[in-house]
From Swiss-Prot:
It is found in: Cytoplasm. Involved in calcium binding and microtubule stabilization. Transmembrane segments: none annotated. GO terms for cellular component: cytoplasm. Belongs to the TCTP family. Residues 1-168 form the TCTP domain. One of its GO terms (molecular function) is calcium ion binding. It comes from Oryza sativa subsp. japonica. This is Translationally-controlled tumor protein homolog. Keywords: Calcium, Cytoplasm. InterPro entries: Mss4-like_sf (IPR011057), Mss4/transl-control_tumour (IPR011323), TCTP (IPR034737), Translation_control_tumour_CS (IPR018103), Translational_control_tumour_p (IPR018105). It holds the Pfam family TCTP.
Length: 168
């Protein structure tokens, strides 16, 4: 299995269990998330509670919770939304920090295409949710989520150059 870690923080953000599509000249990866129900355990023991006078389930209070698979699996932490100024400030810092970690070839490719990806994200800014890795480190990359028209499950966006592939 391959795990993709944030190049700046080491947080696990994605794995090959979630297929991605490259967009914006390969700068962004688009990944489909899914809402899943977690925690509900329905055990049928074959008893008939109404015949025994117990109409209510007297077992444990087992609450079903809906979570997004990617957020839950990688313990992503949602952040407050960014306005345009905050987003541009973040991007400038992120580009500077990430560029320093890339080899010359990847650095050139990243700098050549990041402007288009930034404009793409700015165009969706009001619809984006922002997530960071489990460590919640300020200098780490962001993971973005949004809902495509008519979709009930979120789509996630990752900066491909900000991910490091690790075999598990």
């Amino acid at each position: 299995m391959l795990v993709y870690q944030d190049l700046l923080t080491g947080d696990e953000l994605l794995s090959d269990s979630f297929p991605y599509r490259e967009i914006e000249n390969g700068i962004l990866w688009e990944v489909d998330g899914k809402w899943v129900v977690q925690g509900a355990i329905d055990v049928d023991i074959g008893a008939n509670p109404s015949a025994e006078g117990g109409g209510d389930d007297e077992g444990v209070d087992d609450q079903a919770v809906k979570v997004v698979d990617i957020v839950d699996t990688f313990r992503l932490q949602e952040q407050p939304p960014f306005d345009k100024k905050q987003f541009v400030t973040f991007m400038k810092r992120y580009i500077k920090n990430l560029s320093a970690k890339l080899d010359a070839e990847k650095q050139e490719e990243f700098k050549k295409n990041i402007e288009g990806a930034t404009k793409y994200l700015l165009g969706k800014l009001k619809d984006l949710q922002f997530f960071v890795g489990e460590s919640m480190h300020d200098d780490g990359g962001l993971v973005f989520a949004y809902y495509k028209d008519g979709a009930t499950d979120p789509t996630f966006l990752y900066f491909s150059h900000g991910l490091k592939e690790v075999k598990c």
